[in-house]
Amino acid sequence: MDQSRMTLGRFLAQQCPQDEKGKALALLLRQVGDSCRRIADAVAGGALREMTGAADNVNVQGEEQKKLDVFANDVLIEGCNWGGTVAGMASEEEDDIYTLPEGEPRGPWLLLFDPLDGSSNIDVNVSVGTIFSVLPAPDTGRDPVNEDLLQPGHRQVAAGYAVYGPSTVLVLTLGDGVYAFTLDRGQGEWFLTSSKMKVPEQTAEFAINCSYQRIWPAPIKRYIEECLDGEEGPRGKRFNMRWIASMVADLHRIFTRGGVFLYPADEKRPNGRLRVLYEINPMSMLMEQAGGEAFTGKERALDLQPEALHQRSGLMLGSREEVEVLRRYYAEQ
């Protein structure tokens, strides 16, 4: 694909089907892109826009919300609740499904999102991001109910994230490869900068929060110990550890240069910590489209059948060979 000044809008016009649903999908993803641009401006402004610090609210997860969590959530809802693109939305920050205002046409898609992943890093100026997923809506034209959103990840038609770092990058898949767009702040436009991104099959880098080591399951303890044994150990090579504590930032590094990201279920959180609908499903779709794998500790991540809007699970994803090693260790336990 010719990347010479390919805008997000032009890309979507070429890649989405030209029927009614395809045009609605293209518009929805442009709406998401516009919303992420607004969020990027707010993140960059930080304290100058009074966007740092807590919002004095607690979300459905029991987590203290940051001011930017609330702002990003509102921006995505306001940016995508018009134009007949969605039948409804769900957010990590909301208790229930968002129902469209009366009079707005119900569209063919459902939008699910984590409006600001890694928001605990905002006040220390570390990269954060937005994660999103698109699922088919019921064909009835009615407002969706919870069960309509409880679809396994392999039913996603699109997924992506925006990372708000030194540059702002939007990474997207429509089920035919992974593409990255960089925001030109001067023009306020997303331009294609990477096509058909691939995660290397082999790696010598892992990302995990080692503060949970005492409560890790046996397969994770074994895997990390063998990585740390270096050339003298059973893996026969030296591994490096990376951990940013921002899923989008950690995985963007892996999409760019390889690695494996581990956030397993453990003794304290036997059901895991990551949200299936808002984090695991979209990131797993992107990872498989980039040639990697995603595994929950029990099954392929995209085959997990969610049973609740805010269900959690463990997750290991990244370079194919490392995820296969982890699959084997879990099978042997």
Swiss-Prot record:
Keywords: Carbohydrate metabolism, Cytoplasm, Hydrolase, Magnesium, Metal-binding
Positions that bind Mg(2+) 1: 92, 114, 116
A Pfam family matched in the record: FBPase
Coiled-coil segments: none
Major localisation: cytoplasm
Compartment annotation: Cytoplasm
GO molecular function: fructose 1,6-bisphosphate 1-phosphatase activity; magnesium ion binding
Recorded metabolic or biological pathway in which this protein acts: Carbohydrate biosynthesis; gluconeogenesis
Cofactor(s) needed by this chain: Mg(2+)
Residue positions binding Mg(2+) 2: 114, 117, 279
EC id: 3.1.3.11
Listed InterPro entries: FBPase_C_dom, FBPase_class-1, FBPase_N, FBPtase, Fructose_bisphosphatase_AS
Annotated residues for binding of substrate: 117-120, 209
PROSITE patterns according to UniProt: FBPASE
Uppermost EC category: hydrolase
Gene Ontology BP term (one): sucrose biosynthetic process
GO cellular component: cytosol
Co-factor binding details: Binds 2 magnesium ions per subunit.
Catalyzed reactions: beta-D-fructose 1,6-bisphosphate + H2O = beta-D-fructose 6-phosphate + phosphate
UniProt subunit comment: Homotetramer.
Family (UniProt): Belongs to the FBPase class 1 family.
Name of the protein in its database record: Fructose-1,6-bisphosphatase class 1
Species this chain originates from: Alkalilimnicola ehrlichii (strain ATCC BAA-1101 / DSM 17681 / MLHE-1)
Gene responsible for this protein: fbp
